[in-house]
């Protein structure tokens, strides 16, 4: 299998509770390597650009407000089938439906405050990674 990269965000609800290390432990247990990571405060413009696919949805404003409400940790993860592995490690968007041991089952507060974002495809991952990282920041 080919090694691929995916993009992750540890969201404000998790960073506010100092869960970065705990989330990273789940990521590493899933067999993924963290090859880039930084803690940032997402601007309104960054959040609107990042979530532009949801612009017409009724929750868009709340999503942007939430993602800019506190620090986030943006990451590049690497491994075999990284996109699928990380999505499995995150669990279902609704934490009540997430499998035991997943990030969202363990740490999410609600569907909206679900602690983590992960890319949905390798192509999306490449776009998302480029929004937050330059090539020399990714150390594989």
Curated annotation (Swiss-Prot):
<feature type="binding site">
    <location>
        <position position="104"/>
    </location>
    <ligand>
        <name>ATP</name>
    </ligand>
</feature>
<dbReference type="GO" id="GO:0046872">
    <property type="term" value="F:metal ion binding"/>
</dbReference>
<keyword id="KW-0067">ATP-binding</keyword>
<feature type="active site" description="Pros-phosphohistidine intermediate">
    <location>
        <position position="117"/>
    </location>
</feature>
<dbReference type="GO" id="GO:0006220">
    <property type="term" value="P:pyrimidine nucleotide metabolic process"/>
</dbReference>
<keyword id="KW-0546">Nucleotide metabolism</keyword>
<keyword id="KW-0460">Magnesium</keyword>
<keyword id="KW-0963">Cytoplasm</keyword>
<dbReference type="InterPro" id="IPR023005">
    <property type="entry name" value="Nucleoside_diP_kinase_AS"/>
</dbReference>
<keyword id="KW-0808">Transferase</keyword>
<comment type="similarity">
    <text>Belongs to the NDK family.</text>
</comment>
<dbReference type="GO" id="GO:0005737">
    <property type="term" value="C:cytoplasm"/>
</dbReference>
<keyword id="KW-0597">Phosphoprotein</keyword>
<dbReference type="GO" id="GO:0006241">
    <property type="term" value="P:CTP biosynthetic process"/>
</dbReference>
<dbReference type="Pfam" id="PF00334">
    <property type="entry name" value="NDK"/>
</dbReference>
<dbReference type="GO" id="GO:0006163">
    <property type="term" value="P:purine nucleotide metabolic process"/>
</dbReference>
<feature type="binding site">
    <location>
        <position position="11"/>
    </location>
    <ligand>
        <name>ATP</name>
    </ligand>
</feature>
<feature type="binding site">
    <location>
        <position position="93"/>
    </location>
    <ligand>
        <name>ATP</name>
    </ligand>
</feature>
<dbReference type="GO" id="GO:0005524">
    <property type="term" value="F:ATP binding"/>
</dbReference>
<dbReference type="InterPro" id="IPR036850">
    <property type="entry name" value="NDK-like_dom_sf"/>
</dbReference>
<comment type="subunit">
    <text>Homotetramer.</text>
</comment>
<dbReference type="GO" id="GO:0004550">
    <property type="term" value="F:nucleoside diphosphate kinase activity"/>
</dbReference>
<feature type="binding site">
    <location>
        <position position="87"/>
    </location>
    <ligand>
        <name>ATP</name>
    </ligand>
</feature>
<dbReference type="InterPro" id="IPR001564">
    <property type="entry name" value="Nucleoside_diP_kinase"/>
</dbReference>
<keyword id="KW-0547">Nucleotide-binding</keyword>
<feature type="binding site">
    <location>
        <position position="114"/>
    </location>
    <ligand>
        <name>ATP</name>
    </ligand>
</feature>
<feature type="binding site">
    <location>
        <position position="59"/>
    </location>
    <ligand>
        <name>ATP</name>
    </ligand>
</feature>
<comment type="function">
    <text>Major role in the synthesis of nucleoside triphosphates other than ATP. The ATP gamma phosphate is transferred to the NDP beta phosphate via a ping-pong mechanism, using a phosphorylated active-site intermediate.</text>
</comment>
<dbReference type="GO" id="GO:0006183">
    <property type="term" value="P:GTP biosynthetic process"/>
</dbReference>
<keyword id="KW-0479">Metal-binding</keyword>
<keyword id="KW-0418">Kinase</keyword>
<protein>
    <recommendedName>
        <fullName>Nucleoside diphosphate kinase</fullName>
        <ecNumber>2.7.4.6</ecNumber>
    </recommendedName>
</protein>
<dbReference type="InterPro" id="IPR034907">
    <property type="entry name" value="NDK-like_dom"/>
</dbReference>
<dbReference type="GO" id="GO:0006228">
    <property type="term" value="P:UTP biosynthetic process"/>
</dbReference>
């Amino acid at each position: 299998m080919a090694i691929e990269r995916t993009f992750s965000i540890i969201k404000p609800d998790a960073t506010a509770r100092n869960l970065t290390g705990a989330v990273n432990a789940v990521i590493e247990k899933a067999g993924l390597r963290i090859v880039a990571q930084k803690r940032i405060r997402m601007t309104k413009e960054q959040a609107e650009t990042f979530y532009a696919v949801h612009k017409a949805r009724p929750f868009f404003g709340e999503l942007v407000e939430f993602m800019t409400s506190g620090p986030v940790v943006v990451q590049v993860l690497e491994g075999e089938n990284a996109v699928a592995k990380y999505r499995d490690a995150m669990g279902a968007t609704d934490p009540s439906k997430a499998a035991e041991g997943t990030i969202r089952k363990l740490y999410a507060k609600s569907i909206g405050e679900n602690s983590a974002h992960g890319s949905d495809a390798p192509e999306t991952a490449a776009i998302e990674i480029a929004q937050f990282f330059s090539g020399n920041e990714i150390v594989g």
